[in-house]
A protein has these predicted regions:
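Short coil/loop residues immediately preceding or within conserved phosphate-binding loops
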Residues: 5, 75, 106
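Active-site helix/loop of acyl-thioester processing domains in fatty-acid/polyketide metabolism
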Residues: 10, 41-65
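Conserved positions in beta-strands of structured domains
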Residues: 8-11, 76, 81, 95-97, ...
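Short, electropositive, low-hydrophobicity segments enriched in small/polar residues
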Residues: 24, 37, 41, 47, ...
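HotDog/MaoC-like acyl-thioester-processing domains
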Residues: 84-93, 97-131
Length: 131
């Protein structure tokens, strides 16, 4: 949700994977301080973009996704291979590693700029129905 939405659109969604797109623009507020005169899209926000994209995959498995929340439980093996700058378009791929059981889902995330991997991580989340 705005103002913390880090996925512009979903371009592919199946039972086992999802692909989202995020266009990085200089207008993003965090570029004022990260870093002045040398804008770099923060790695922690790349992980958040993976989490948001993965949340769409996880919630696509329930009948009424608007009544569920996704909570991320674990981030593993996060790697940042190249910096992301204004003008880049991120292709965010999330793959389900095993069937969702008891609301727990394990995913592998990879972010590309063009054909180049810029970051990757394993994420574990839980989907919970709102009471």
């Amino acid at each position: 949700r705005y103002p913390f939405l880090l996925v512009d659109k979903i371009i592919d969604l199946s039972e086992s994977h999802v692909v989202g797109v995020k266009n990085i623009t200089f207008n993003e507020g965090f570029f004022q301080g990260h870093f002045p005169g040398n804008p770099v899209f923060p790695g922690v926000l790349q992980i958040e973009a993976m989490a948001q994209t993965g949340g769409i995959l996880a919630l696509s498995t329930v009948a009424d996704p608007g009544n569920w929340d996704t909570y991320f439980l674990k981030i593993e093996e996060a790697k940042f291979k190249s910096k992301v700058v204004p003008g880049d378009t991120l292709l965010i791929k999330m793959e389900l590693l095993a069937p969702i059981r008891r609301g727990i889902c394990q995913m592998q995330g990879t972010i590309y700029v063009g054909n180049k991997i810029v970051s990757e991580a394993g994420l574990t989340a839980q989907i919970v129905k709102r009471s």
